[in-house]
Structures are given as structure tokens and as C-alpha cells.
UniProtKB/Swiss-Prot annotation:
Its EC number is 6.1.1.16. One of its GO terms (biological process) is cysteinyl-tRNA aminoacylation. A motif ('KMSKS' region) lies at residues 271-275. A motif ('HIGH' region) lies at residues 32-42. It comes from the Bacteria. It comes from Aliarcobacter butzleri (strain RM4018). One of its GO terms (molecular function) is ATP binding. This is Cysteine--tRNA ligase. The gene is cysS. SUPFAM superfamilies: Anticodon-binding domain of a subclass of class I aminoacyl-tRNA synthetases, Nucleotidylyl transferase.
Length: 467
């Protein structure tokens, strides 16, 4: 196995990744709260840790990738009453929409996708355990976690108790400490609630993830329950800090050996989020750009750095991706052989250095430029073509781009009825050329050109692409 280095949020530095169990990796990524459609911020987090998943697999690790769905939350309940829909109708709608978006981005399937509402019993058990240890206590409105009972509280986010207190928004005069947070919210009018030994209500946000990790992933004989816990930088505090505290005090284990966080997507200098009302829904961006172009754009900046959304950069990313597919067209129909050793090493060296996609994509740019020069000099070199298609297949394996049909890629955004019209005009043009009616053939080409369709006459027939 190659040596992978990742940036650990606790140590605030790059460290060598060493799994808890040899050859196996357990990862938990905080998934969406399913009350609305996904935006580019969700896409960025998904792509960042999909890249981690792919790099680990290429390094021969067996990966258990888990991403949850928060399907019980204040925002979901608010949506219920706004739309007069059931909780299940809303959450299923947005879970399905999220999965469709992830498919468009070529995100590898998760091993486990737990829902909060399907794991209530383990949440109740954890809360009961914390109450029995006097680490949690009841007030009139909730069961709270007592942050003063955890000496390590704040060590993940590197915040002092004063900073933690100022950052909290849960104000209740019955709380022992201003930083204490709700584990279980007691039933209110027009609320969704579940029976529990400590009172009818519903779980707080933080306990959900701790409980799902405990149930589905946790090593029992290790100081750490899982290898990597990941999510957006906005989750570092309070969400991940609170998760870590709950698990420490409940099980005596550390939640994760490593913590990883991706940067924001910013709009006009502010983090993109639904609550701020400045988010670009992924489904809307997908109307103009393929998921593959969006993927390329979002991984062109290192995952830890903030990214300022700019459509000009999105267009530039498409042009770079176009070059991969133009090369793929030049080696179309060739069987692969083996990846160029130096190319593979250069890509892996970049990605094993904390998933450095910027360098990896630069290596690809250089390979494409060199390949085109070689093909220009010797267009019939089959061994070269076999190596190049192997290189492109490796790019898809480790970066998730370049795996689609080269001709279909350049036809993105054309609906079926328009495709039928284009194919019909091409057939008419071909017939006109056969009968040497070049005037008609030229008129048909001009008509297609007015539709922003470019034609290329090849030995295998006429192919077209959208300009």
C-alpha cells in the first residue's frame, strides 16, 4: 500500500494515515438534513470525501463508507406544516432528489446510509447511559448534555469554554452551563415525538450521528470507534465537537482517529447555505452543466480551501474536461492495456498528499498535451493509443471524471426530439453528398450550424457535437 497523508483537524496538520484495522477503513460523513434540494455546498462535501473513498480503494483498502440522512429536525417539521405533507413524504422526496444529484456527480455508492428515525432506540440507550452517569440531566424542555463533565470538550474545535458559550444559541435558564446542548427535546404542540424512558419527544441533532456510528460502525476493542469522521468545516463546531463529547462520555472511546473537514463554497464572500438564502441548487446548475463538469470544477480547488463560486471558472473547468474527451475520441474503440507507470505514480503522489487534486489535474493536463503531440506525429501508433485509453480509465477510477462516452459527452443538453431532428438532417445531408448535390448538403450543414451543432466527417461516418 502507498502511504497516504491527510490533514487531521484535531492536530491541525498533515499526518500519515494508519487505519485501526490493517487494510480496512471505516468512514462516516455527515449527510444532509432532508428538507430541501441540495446546493453546491453539499456537492462539494460529497465530492471531497468521494475522492478520499476512491484514493483509499486505489491504495487497496477495503472501505466502509457511511453517510447518514437527518430525517427528523426543526426545519423538516416546519416544512411539514408549510406544505401539509407528512414527515415521510418530505424526507423521502429529498432523499431521492439527493441520490439523483449524487449519481449525476458520479459519487460512489455508500456502504451504509442510515436514517435518524430508523436508529431511535440506540439514541435512547445512549441518552439513558449519559443520564445514569450524571453527564446528562433533565430540564422542563429537554435532556441536556453537561459540557462541564467532559474535560476534553473543546479540544476538537480548539475553542475555549468562553468561545463555546458565546457560540451557543440554545438558551434555557435551567441549563447548568451555557454551552450545554440538547440530547432530547421534549414534546411540544404540533411537534413530532417518540416515546422514551426519560420523556416523550425527539432527538437533538448531535446525538443522531453518535448513535448511528455506535450502531453501524463502532469498533468495540479499540480506543477509537471509527477511522475517519468527515464533513463540512461548518460542522466542526458545534456539531462534531458535541458528537465527540457524547461518545467519549457514553462509551469511553474516542469517536474517530482522524477528523477531516472541507472548505466552504462562498457567494459574494459568504458561505453558501439554504438558511442564508444564497445557495445555488444543484438541480438548477445541472440544467446548464453536466454533473461531470460540476465535479471537475469543485475539485479543481483543494478540498480544504474555500471556493468562491464563479461561472467563468466553471466554464474554464469544462474546457479542461473537454480536452480529456477530445483525447478519448482520438483513441476511440481501442482496447486498454496498462497505465503509464510514471503517470499513475504522479497522480497517486498528488492524491496521497492530502487529496491534492490541483496537482493531479495539472498532471492530467500535461499528459493530454504530450499525448496529442505524439498522436499528431504518429496517429497510427496502437500501443500509444492503448496506453492512453488506460490512462483515461485510471483517471475515471481515481478522480471520477472521463468515464463517459466521448461522443455523448459533447451532446450534453440536447433533448431526444432535437437529437432526432439532428440525426434526420445528417442523414439527408449524407444522401445529398452521395448524389453529389453539394449545394443541398451545404445548406443542411448551415442549418445544423445555426442550431450550434458542429459536424465531423470521419471514416466511420458523420459525428456531431454541441458547440
Amino acid at each position: 500500500m502507498n502511504t497516504l497523508h491527510i490533514f487531521d483537524s484535531v492536530k491541525k496538520e498533515k499526518v500519515e494515515f494508519k487505519p485501526i484495522q490493517e487494510g480496512k477503513v471505516k468512514i462516516y460523513v455527515c449527510g444532509p438534513t432532508v428538507y430541501d434540494d441540495s446546493h453546491l455546498g453539499h456537492a462539494r462535501s460529497a465530492i471531497a470525501f468521494d475522492l478520499l473513498h476512491r484514493v483509499l480503494k486505489v491504495n487497496d483498502y477495503e472501505v466502509t463508507m457511511t453517510k447518514n440522512f437527518t430525517d427528523i429536525d426543526d426545519k423538516i417539521i416546519k416544512k411539514m406544516y408549510e406544505t401539509n405533507k407528512t414527515l415521510e413524504n418530505i424526507t423521502n422526496q429529498y432523499i431521492n432528489a439527493y441520490k439523483a444529484d449524487m449519481k449525476a456527480l458520479n459519487i460512489l455508492d455508500n456502504t451504509i446510509e442510515p436514517k435518524a428515525t430508523e436508529n431511535l432506540e440506540v439514541m435512547k440507550e445512549m441518552i439513558s447511559n449519559l443520564i445514569s452517569k450524571d453527564v446528562a440531566y433533565k430540564t422542563s424542555d429537554s435532556v441536556y448534555f453537561d459540557t462541564s463533565k467532559d474535560n476534553l470538550y473543546g479540544t476538537l474545535s480548539h475553542k475555549s469554554n468562553d468561545e463555546n458559550s458565546q457560540a451557543r444559541v440554545e438558551e434555557n435558564q435551567e441549563k447548568r452551563n451555557s454551552a450545554d446542548f440538547a440530547l432530547w427535546k421534549f414534546e411540544k404542540a404540533n411537534d413530532v415525538s417518540f416515546d422514551a424512558p426519560f420523556g416523550k419527544g425527539r432527538p437533538g441533532w448531535h446525538i443522531e450521528c453518535s448513535a448511528m456510528i455506535e450502531k453501524h460502525l463502532a469498533y468495540k476493542d479499540s480506543p477509537y470507534q471509527i477511522d475517519i469522521h468527515a464533513g463540512g468545516a461548518d460542522l466542526l463546531f458545534p456539531h462534531h465537537e458535541n458528537e465527540a463529547a457524547q461518545t467519549r462520555c457514553s462509551s469511553g472511546q474516542n469517536l474517530a482517529k482522524y477528523w477531516m473537514h472541507n472548505g466552504f463554497v462562498n457567494i459574494n464572500g459568504e458561505k453558501m447555505s439554504k438558511s442564508l438564502g444564497n445557495s445555488f441548487f444543484l438541480k438548477d446548475v445541472l440544467k446548464s452543466y453536466s454533473g461531470e463538469v460540476i465535479r471537475f470544477y469543485l475539485m479543481s480547488t483543494h478540498y480544504r480551501a474555500d471556493l468562491s463560486f464563479n461561472e467563468e471558472d466553471l466554464i474554464a473547468s469544462k474546457k479542461r474536461l473537454d480536452k480529456i474527451y477530445r483525447l478519448k475520441k482520438r483513441v476511440y474503440g481501442i482496447e486498454d492495456s496498462s497505465v503509464n507507470k510514471k503517470f499513475k505514480e504522479d497522480i497517486l503522489n498528488a492524491l496521497n498528499d492530502d487529496i491534492n487534486t490541483s496537482i493531479a489535474l495539472s498532471v492530467i493536463d500535461e499528459m493530454i498535451n504530450s499525448a496529442n503531440d505524439k498522436l499528431d506525429s504518429n496517429p497510427k501508433d496502437k500501443n500509444l493509443k492503448k496506453e492512453l485509453i488506460s490512462n483515461i480509465n485510471f483517471i475515471e477510477e481515481v478522480l471520477g471524471i472521463g468515464g463517459n462516452d466521448a461522443y455523448a459527452y459533447f451532446q450534453f443538453g440536447i433533448n431526444e426530439s432535437t437529437k432526432e431532428k439532428i440525426e434526420s438532417l445528417i442523414l439527408k445531408r449524407n444522401e445529398a453528398k452521395k448524389t453529389k448535390d453539394f449545394q443541398t448538403a451545404d445548406k443542411l450543414r448551415d442549418e445544423l450550424s445555426s442550431m450550434d451543432i458542429s459536424l465531423m466527417d470521419t471514416v466511420n461516418g458523420t459525428v456531431w457535437e454541441k458547440l
